[in-house]
Amino acid sequence: MNLEQLINVLGLLVWIAARAVSRVGPHGSGLVYRELHDFYGYLQLDLLGPVVAGNRSVRTWREQADRARGTFAWRSGLNTSRILPVGSMYRGSDALPAGLYRPEEEVFLLLNRCHGPLSTPKNACLAEVGVANATFLSRFNVGDFHGASWENGTAPDGEPGVC
C-alpha cells in the first residue's frame, strides 16, 4: 500500500467518524458537502465528489483542476436555462430521481458547458446550490462568468455567447 492509498483510507475513516459524531450532535445535521469538499480538497483526495450526488456533474477538486487546464473529458452537463426541481437534476436527456440529495445539503454543480482558460471554480463554472424541500432551483446566474465561451451556442436564453 503506497502513501496515497494510505492517506485515502485514513481520510475516509476520519470522514466516517466525523459524520457519525455530527449526526448524533445537538443539531444532528451531519456534515454538509462544502465541508467535505474542503476537507478532501485539502487532503488531495477525490473520493466523495461523485458519491455525494451520484452524478458526474458534481466534480472533485482534481477534475476541476483538469478542467481549468483544459485536460478534462467532456461529459453531458447542466442546461442552465432549465428550472430544476428539488431531488432531480437535468442531465442531458434524463433527470436523476428524487432522494439522491438530503434536504438542505449543499452540492457543487459544475456548469459543464462553460469552457475556457478562466472557467475555474472561483471564476465561473461552479455554482453552490442549497437544496431544500418544497423549493425550486431557478436558472443559474451567469452574469459574473467571464473569460469563457458556451459550447456550440448552448448559452442560456438571453445570455451572450460568453460566460
UniProtKB/Swiss-Prot annotation:
Which segment of the chain is annotated as a signal peptide? 1-22
Which superkingdom?
Answer: Viruses
- Alphabetical keyword list: Signal
Q: Which family does it belong to?
A: Belongs to the HHV-5 US34 protein family.
Kindly provide the name given to this protein in its UniProt entry. Protein US34
